[in-house]
């Protein structure tokens, strides 16, 4: 191959993208992956904390905890299918329990919300990660509150007490 053809080959990028575009896409994919991991891990950990509290404070055994898990999965599936939104769940919790899930989630201290995830968060992305963690906590509070109120006939006081124990 001649030198001219070799130079031309080096300039050409795969798939018609420039090197900068490829790097930008890789960075975006990496941040999306990190965000998804952060949300999933925090959701899993807050779920485990709530199960421990329901077991210790309210005497829930394996069967009732699995019923809570089943009801929450049903809510998540209907939310994913578009039949129910998290705003509707928050409204339902506000109407039935008199508790604002968003306000409760915002009462969780910023630094302590990062204890829900094992991975270290880069200092530059702390604000956005904190917002994602607060949203994850808010969504789980709404799911759990509606589940306990409708599925187990918890009183307003019991739901509020459960959310307070989860916060600490």
Region spans (language model):
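Amphipathic alpha-helical segments that form the core helices of the histone-fold
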Residues: 68-77, 162-167
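Intrinsic disorder/low-complexity detector
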Residues: 5-50, 78, 84-145
């Amino acid at each position: 191959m001649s030198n001219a053809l070799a130079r031309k080959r080096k300039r050409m990028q795969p798939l018609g993208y420039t090197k900068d575009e490829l790097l930008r896409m890789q960075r975006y994919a990496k941040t999306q992956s990190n965000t998804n991991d952060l949300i999933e891990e925090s959701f899993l950990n807050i779920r485990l904390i709530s199960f421990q509290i329901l077991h210790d404070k309210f005497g829930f055994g394996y069967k009732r905890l699995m019923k809570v898990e089943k009801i929450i999965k049903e809510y998540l599936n209907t939310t994913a299918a578009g039949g129910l939104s998290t705003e509707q769940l928050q409204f339902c919790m506000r109407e039935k329990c008199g508790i604002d899930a968003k306000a409760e989630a915002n009462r969780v201290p910023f630094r302590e919300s990062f204890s829900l995830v094992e991975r270290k968060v880069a200092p530059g992305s702390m604000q956005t990660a904190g917002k994602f963690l607060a949203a994850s906590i808010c969504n789980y509070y709404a799911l759990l509150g509606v589940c306990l109120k409708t599925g187990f006939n918890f009183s307003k006081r019991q739901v509020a007490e459960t959310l307070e124990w989860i916060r600490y």
